[in-house]
Amino acid sequence: MEALLQGLQRQDRMGALQDSCEAELQELMKQIDIMLDHKRSQWEAETETMKTRLELKEQELNCALDSEERLNQEVRRLRQQLIQQEEETQNKTTQYEAQLSGFKEELNRLKKSYEKVQKKHLRSEMKAKAEEERSEVSRLTRRLEEFRQRSLDWEKQRLLYQQQLSGLEAQRKTLIEQTEMYQQQSHNRKQMLEQTNLVGRSELQNLSGQLHRANDSLCAKEEELETLKIQLRCAVEGQKRAEHETELSKQAVQALKEKAELRATLQAHTEFLQGSRVQKHELLPEGYRGSEVLRENNSIRSLEERLQETGQVGGETEVEAIRSKLSVSRMNEQRLQAEVTCLEDSVESVTSQCQLLAKELKGKEEYLHGVKEDHQKCLSENKKLKGQLSQAELTHKSVLDGMRKEISQLTQELHQRDIRMASSAGIDWERKIKAERQRAEREAAEHRMSLNALENLRQENCRLSELLQTQEPDVAQALVNLEQANQRLQRELLQTQEKLELIAQRRESEIQNAVDSISQELLNKQEQELRIMQERLKVYEQEMQTFRSQQDAASSGSSLESIFSEVWKEQATGSPISAASVDSAIEPVEDLASSLPVPPTSPANAVASRFLQEEEQRSHELLQRLNAHIEELKQESQRTVEHFTQAR
């Protein structure tokens, strides 16, 4: 009975093992099917992407071929255009050369006529200048006479000041006599002085005690200063510590930045490790399954060994059934391995096809690179042809620039002549202003001399008052009065000095402002004239361009005659000639030279006359201002003299 029970228990165990093996085999089959489906979908997607790439590359090749054909057509068309343009440029150059020869002849004629007119104009200008110079000489002589009269007045004032100084010296002598009298009285009052000396000694003792106290307070203050110095040193050390702490904080910030970078790297490493762990977890069940299969095999072998030991027939049949199932499972595994190998072979074939396609793509890319090089060569040829065209245009422009430079030189010569005239007038005015400034400085020096004399008198009065204080203590009230008078005189002297300095500064500032304004106006006028000349040249260039486009000589001739008629009408009426009329009269000269009238004169004389008139007005205003300042100085000096005389 016991043997039967053991056999039944063994059969139950073997049945449980068979059920577990079948379930595991089914799970393995399902997983293998899932893997195969996933790999098939991946391979199909890769093949589709490769096909789409191939189609795109073929389309790009077709587009490149089309663009190459278009470029070839454009190159042919551009070559034809270049040939046509070269022919046209040759024709135009011949025409322009013929026109330039005509223009040069006309310019030579115009230069000769302009030189004649310029000579006449210079003669008339020389006459006008001589008359203006005579008038200026007469005007300057008048001014010199006026300045001489003013200098005589100033000399008279100087004599008055000298007389006042002599009166002050007489007063000083009287004061000396009074001091002698005071000295005689001082001998009589020596006894009073001795008594006062005793009182003074007691006062000196009190003062010495006060001095000791002051010294003690000074020592205390010095100690406080030393404590303050120590505090300053502590503050400096604290500042240094704060700087050191700031440096440490900067280093800490840098360390924090480095920590942040290290944390970022650690996060990247952790993410990588997490990915590897996920892969590991995904692979662990497969390993567990393999280990379970190995355990089952080991258990089967152990059962076989036990059965061999027991020698029971029923156990052998069960073992054979299990072996048959295992053989079936092995066959299935072999079949699956064969399918996997087939799939790997298919993958290798697909990869080889991909490599072939990549090689084909490389070949097509090289072909495209060659096409691009051809295109660049075509572009370089086009650039060369364009450079040739630009050189031809530059040669033509250089010829035109030469003509423009000749015309600009003539205009610059005229402008320089006008500038010289204006600059000479400005230099004369600057010389006059410098002379007036020197005279004003001389007057200020004379006033300073008088002030120095007054200061010397004040010092002598102070010395006398000190002598009186030392000799006669009873005359303290008189000395106090004298000191008050001296202080009042000092204040008045300071006030007069300040007034004189302010007046001198004002005069210098006014003279400097006048010089600056004159120079600034001259510069502005010169800049305006330069701008006008530049605008004229620009207008001339624009009209030259329009003139090139015009080919009808008759119309240009008629316009030229109408322009010159307008100019001569303006001259007849006496109206000022504008810059536009002058430019319009000069511009068509390059086309025709027949029936040319004499060109009008430039407005430089009118500008110079206006400038001289304005400068004369300004000089009159400056002279009036200087006269007013001189009168004010005279009045102030008279007031000071009267004040001093009243005080004395």
UniProtKB/Swiss-Prot annotation:
Keywords: Cell cycle, Cell division, Coiled coil, Cytoplasm, Cytoskeleton, DNA damage, Mitosis, Phosphoprotein. Phosphorylation at Ser-559 by atm and atr promotes its delocalization from the centrosome and impairs its ability to promote centrosome dependent spindle assembly. The modification Phosphoserine is found at S559. GO terms for cellular component: centriole; centrosome; cytoplasm; spindle pole. Residues 19-188, 222-555, 611-644 form a coiled coil. Its main location: cytoplasm. GO terms for biological process: cell division; centriole replication; de novo centriole assembly involved in multi-ciliated epithelial cell differentiation; DNA damage checkpoint signaling; signal transduction in response to DNA damage; spindle assembly. It is found in: Cytoplasm, Cytoskeleton, Microtubule organizing center, Centrosome, Centriole; Cytoplasm, Cytoskeleton, Microtubule organizing center, Centrosome. Pfam families: CEP63. Belongs to the CEP63 family. Required for normal spindle assembly. Plays a key role in mother-centriole-dependent centriole duplication. Plays a role in DNA damage response. Following DNA damage, such as double-strand breaks (DSBs), is removed from centrosomes; this leads to the inactivation of spindle assembly and delay in mitotic progression. This is Centrosomal protein of 63 kDa-B.
